């Protein structure tokens, strides 16, 4: 049976929205300030939704999240800077204080409205600065796919 968990103190990615986490299993260690969710994990915050096999959250002393790490078939639908994205990777890390995402191993990021696609071994995205960085593993190159509208000559 799936365990529905709404974490009371688990608010803000800077915007004071409630985070809801659904998983098969939940583990917390208050001394280490860590929570671990395993099995069919779904994290929802506003319109953003993350699914993965496992999500680990590290908290500060005020019980605010410092870092989210999603592993195992991690997929995310999110809005960043008024753009809608889908991302997938073996591991995803989100730093809410810096508004930074890191997608690691078989990383893919798709901007839905403009149909831009980025593939790489590691994708770094900063919401605050609008900076994107993509790295390869040396075996496969980074790939960026986008459409160009050709203007017709009269």
Predicted feature residues:
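Mature-chain termini and adjacent capping regions
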Residues: 1-154
């Amino acid at each position: 049976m799936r365990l529905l968990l709404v974490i009371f103190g688990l608010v803000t990615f800077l915007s004071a929205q409630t985070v809801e986490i659904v998983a098969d299993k939940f583990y917390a260690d208050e001394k280490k300030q860590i929570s671990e969710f395993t099995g069919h994990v779904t994290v929802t915050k506003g319109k953003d939704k993350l699914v993965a096999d496992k999500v680990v959250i590290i908290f500060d002393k005020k019980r605010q999240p410092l870092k989210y790490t999603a592993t195992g078939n991690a997929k995310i639908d999110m809005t960043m800077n008024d753009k809608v994205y889908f991302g997938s990777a073996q591991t995803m890390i989100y730093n809410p204080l810096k508004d930074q995402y890191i997608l690691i191993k078989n990383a893919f990021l798709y901007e839905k409205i403009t149909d831009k696609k980025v593939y790489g071994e590691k994708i770094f995205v900063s919401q605050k600065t609008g900076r994107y960085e993509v790295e390869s593993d040396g075996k496969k190159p980074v790939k960026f796919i986008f459409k160009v509208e050709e203007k017709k000559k009269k």
